[in-house]
């Protein structure tokens, strides 16, 4: 399925039905009073968060979402039926903006969260409402009110506890596959991962077994200049915004001119350009591919160089599992630590 994380569309709520002009027509009552019913209310356009969705692809095909109008009122004081709501599911993590003003209308962060983005118009009143001592047979009724219409911009930002960063081919996809049930595409060429990949990491059997879990997001490969649109560009840097902690993978690859500390500094620079606040979040820095002899031999010197830069460098191998359990526990602790203040504030 193609990953789409932003789109624009129009939403049109239903118009209210018109009130009716009608009179009682009963035997022996030749001049019955007013009996016009009210028009029905127009339907709303509603978005509902769905944790099972991961793309806005469907909205690239349906550029206009329209709810039903209310039925008109009828005689015998019969009211029109309300128009049906137009209900559409959205991926959890979607932000809804007014396309013209740029105002954030809603942030869909929970499964089942409902957001009314366009309200249906009220139904008009029938002539029964206009009867008075001075006018016992009113011949007027109200038209229904128009439903709201607006242009929206939808932006999806993945919801994850830990954001996984690193140059292309730093081993991010291999790590996600090793610690979760996610199966990202893995290859030996740049930008193997072209969309954010979410993986659920379970500890001690997961929540159901009395353990814990957290979500990790493999953000597509960042390169110098990403904050200005180079490579896959800023389109995916946005997905780091909701993470609580960062896991930064570096690798030793002299054949491609990769130097771990230089790579780390380059991507830290991009993060700071994009968002100084995100750059200050807790992070763990890891040298991958410990199963390779050249990596293991170089680790002591690299660790010392990172230490001079006041950065602790871990060593793991996603292929053999070396260092992975300890790293997962440390990430889980970071995710919990960041979550606790938010819960206390709430």
From Swiss-Prot:
Obg domain location: 1-159
Major subcellular site: cytoplasm
UniProt GO MF annotations: GTP binding; GTPase activity; magnesium ion binding
Matches recorded under Pfam families: GTP1_OBG, MMR_HSR1
Highest taxon, organism lineage: Bacteria
SUPFAM superfamilies from the UniProt entry: Obg GTP-binding protein N-terminal domain, P-loop containing nucleoside triphosphate hydrolases
InterPro entries assigned to the protein according to its UniProt record, in alphabetical order: G_OBG (IPR031167), GTP-bd (IPR006073), GTP-bd_Obg/CgtA (IPR014100), GTP1-OBG_CS (IPR006074), GTP1_OBG_dom (IPR006169), GTP1_OBG_dom_sf (IPR036726), OBG_GTPase (IPR045086), P-loop_NTPase (IPR027417)
Residues covered by the OBG-type G domain: 160-336
Disordered: annotated segments: 122-147
Protein name as it appears in the record: GTPase Obg
This protein's encoding gene: obg
